[in-house]
A protein has these predicted regions:
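Thiol-based oxidoreductase modules, predominantly thioredoxin-like and allied folds used
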Residues: 5-7, 23-34
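Non-catalytic, surface beta->alpha helical segment in thiol-disulfide oxidoreductase systems
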Residues: 46-64
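Structural micro-motif
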Residues: 38-46
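Local sequence-structure signature of Cys/Sec-based thiol-disulfide redox active-site neighborhoods
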Residues: 1-22
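A short acidic, often aromatic-flanked loop/helix-cap motif at beta-alpha or helix-coil junctions
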Residues: 33-36, 59
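Short secondary-structure boundary/hinge segments and terminal tails
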Residues: 36-37, 52
Length: 64
């Protein structure tokens, strides 16, 4: 399962848009949940316990 930890930033919005346009399924989690897990720099995409920062997450989303 893919988990997206996002906030209200432009980067989060653009990543959500890219994931949705490629029809990639993900669970959306809040900034509070991210902070509780120690993710301070959002957005963060977690795939099979592998943490992807914004740049890597966008690459993943664009590959579909």
């Amino acid at each position: 399962m893919i988990k997206l930890y996002a906030n209200d930033s432009y980067k989060s919005f653009s990543l959500i848009f890219e994931l949705d346009s490629r029809e990639i399924d993900y669970e959306l989690h809040s900034q509070d949940e991210a902070s509780a897990l120690g993710y301070n720099k959002l957005p963060v995409l977690v795939i099979d316990n592998k943490i992807l920062d914004y740049k890597k997450a966008m690459r993943y989303a664009k590959k579909g």
